[in-house]
């Protein structure tokens, strides 16, 4: 009951956008946009070598759009509740539902880069995947650990919602997409390298103040340099969610 009252106060007192669409004329440097452009430029240069991925653009757009809608709703609610927010000095100045346009683009650019990396690894290292037994064990350990985290930190909004998403994503993976998970567990470790670079820049590696800030009262308060540890689970849920839908739309073929 105490938690429900506290959480209600968070959302009741949340800042409500006066306008759905908002534009700020004064912009310091649209660094957020530059980060997205730099992120997408590398895979775009090499897409010619992976024509199978290019041929499935419609599947990519569908899967990414579905996941983006879910995560944007989460994003908007947390932004309005003050659980995280954005520094407009490093954005173009155009905001929708209190989120800069760059944040909307994030949910299309990052999945594209990450899925491209996954399929590039599949193409160049076809034997780069785990066995079924070890994959199940890793998934079960992660699910159990995340369930424990959810139970012990249910009052922290980001930690709790992030844990819930991760539990659902891993469970779906084990039950329906085990072969996909066998490969993604390893490719995710590679994907985390550029993901941490992007997130590091967004959370203050090279700027006086972060482009994306977090209210540490609503997370564990554990940072990997400047990045909240919850962002790892966030990234996994977003990217593997994209991949599951992407493969679901695929004609009847092996999804390893």
Q: Which residue ranges define each predicted feature?
A:
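Short aromatic-rich membrane-water interface segments that cap or initiate transmembrane helices
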Residues: 91-105, 218-233
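Membrane-interface capping segments at transmembrane-helix boundaries
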Residues: 123-127, 247-256
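Short, hydrophobic transmembrane alpha-helix segments
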Residues: 45-58, 152-155
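A generic, lipid-embedded transmembrane alpha helix
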Residues: 66-83
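Hydrophobic transmembrane alpha-helical segments in integral membrane proteins
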Residues: 25-39
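Alpha-helical transmembrane segments and their membrane-interface exit regions
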Residues: 165-176, 195
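Hydrophobic cores of alpha-helical transmembrane segments in multi-pass inner/ER membrane proteins
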Residues: 36-44, 104-119, 167-172, 230-246
């Amino acid at each position: 009951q105490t938690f429900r009252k506290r959480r209600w106060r968070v959302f009741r007192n949340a800042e409500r956008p006066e306008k759905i669409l908002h534009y700020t004329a004064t912009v310091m440097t649209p660094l957020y946009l530059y980060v997205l452009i730099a992120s997408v430029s590398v895979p775009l240069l090499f897409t010619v070598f992976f024509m199978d991925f290019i041929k499935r653009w419609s599947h990519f757009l569908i899967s990414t759009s579905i996941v983006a809608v879910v995560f944007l709703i989460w994003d908007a609610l947390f932004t309005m509740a003050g659980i995280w927010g954005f520094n407009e000095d490093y954005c173009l100045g155009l905001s929708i539902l209190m989120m800069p346009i760059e944040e909307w683009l994030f949910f299309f650019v990052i999945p594209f880069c990450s899925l491209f990396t996954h399929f590039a690894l599949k193409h160049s290292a076809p034997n780069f995947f785990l066995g079924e037994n070890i994959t199940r064990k890793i998934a079960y350990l992660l699910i159990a650990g995340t369930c424990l985290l959810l139970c012990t930190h249910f009052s922290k909004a980001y930690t709790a919602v992030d844990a819930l998403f991760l539990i659902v994503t891993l469970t779906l993976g084990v039950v329906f997409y085990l072969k996909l998970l066998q490969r993604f567990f390893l490719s995710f470790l590679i994907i985390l390298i550029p993901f941490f670079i992007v997130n590091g820049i967004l959370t203050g590696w090279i700027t006086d103040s972060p482009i994306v800030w977090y209210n540490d009262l609503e997370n564990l308060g554990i940072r990997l340099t400047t990045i909240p540890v919850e962002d790892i689970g966030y990234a996994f849920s977003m990217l593997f969610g994209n991949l599951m839908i992407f493969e679901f739309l695929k004609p009847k073929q092996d999804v390893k």
